Each structure stands twice: as C-alpha cells, then as structure tokens.
A protein has these predicted regions:
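A conserved beta-turn-beta hairpin within the catalytic core of GNAT-like acetyltransferases
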Residues: 51, 62-73, 83, 102-105, ...
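Short, small-residue-biased leader/transition segments that mark boundaries at the very start
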Residues: 1-3
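A short helix-loop-beta-strand connector motif used in the catalytic cores of GNAT acetyltransferases and
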Residues: 32-45, 72
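C-terminal "cap" of GNAT-fold acetyltransferases
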Residues: 105-159
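Conserved beta-strand in the GNAT
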Residues: 45, 51-60
Length: 159
C-alpha cells in the first residue's frame, strides 16, 4: 500500500466534499497513525493499471447492543474518473470479509446529505439510514475545556 496514495485520497475526498480548507492532517500524521507501531486505523485500497483508484479508511468500534466489535468506515472515496467500475463495491466486500473473518457484527459510516450517488450505492449494498439518530462531533476547544474540567475534578487519562 502506498502511503502517499492514502494521503492524496484523503485530500481528494475533502476537495470533493468542498472542505479542503478543513483538512488538518499531514502526510507525517498519516504515516504515524496508519503505519506506525500501534495503528488504530486502516486503509483498504483498490488499484487498477492506472494506479490507486479508491480507498476505504476504517477503525474498530464496539456495539453494546450487538455485544460485538464492528467497523466504522471513516472515509470511502473513489476517484471521479474511476467511478462506475465497481470499486466501491470491492472496498465494501473487503470490509465485509474482515468482519466475517473476525466475527464482528456491524459496519457503520456517515454520508454527506447532498451526495445522492453515494447514498444510492450504500442503499443498493444493503446499508440503511438510521432514523431518529444524529451524528455529533467534538473538536478542539470543547475537548480541551472538558479535559480541564476533568483535571479539576481529579480525573486522569490513565486507562
């Protein structure tokens, strides 16, 4: 797997989502988090004779309701010129094989609301919208503020 391709696909996805200005990661961070001593995130790549055409970036989750580990697919991206060739399906198949091999129960992901072609692909493969649930995110200052409150309450980060 080419590290540079993984980073380039992350940047291409951000550009596609009209969010290039929000990418904070660097090639060095991709190397450390995906290929360092203790990776916690993985990338499955699909290539053809023209090179790497797509990527599914994922990490392990846990479902208390299922009592099982699972996969959260953080990013799925196929280069525009390679769409319609079944590459997204191949990436999903690879993740399904990993899940089946490990006995994991569930795969989850999010999709931007205006990306109807992706929504159509996900539904075609058996994905379901989770009615009544919203995704939330916390980045930066709110995290720091909560950590400071925790320190003031005598908490530590020890696991």
């Amino acid at each position: 797997m080419c590290i540079r391709d993984s980073y380039d696909l992350v940047c291409n996805l951000a550009e596609f989502q009209k969010a290039s200005d929000r990418v904070r990661t660097s090639l060095e961070q991709i190397v450390e988090t995906m290929f360092g001593d203790n990776p916690q995130v993985w990338a499955e790549l699909v290539e053809d004779e023209d090179g790497v055409q797509g990527m599914a970036l994922w990490f392990v989750t846990y479902s208390t309701w299922e009592g099982s580990y699972g996969i959260h697919m953080e990013d799925l991206f196929v280069r525009p010129e390679a769409r319609g060739k079944g590459y997204a399906s191949l990436l999903f198949q690879r993740l399904a094989l990993i899940m089946e091999e490990k006995g994991w129960a569930r795969m989850e992901w999010t999709v931007i609301d205006w990306n109807q072609p992706a929504i159509d692909v996900y539904q075609h493969m058996g994905g379901e919208e989770i009615e009544g649930w919203y995704d939330y995110r916390m980045i930066g200052e709110p995290v720091h503020a909560l950590a400071e409150q925790g320190r003031q309450n005598g908490l530590t980060a020890e696991l």
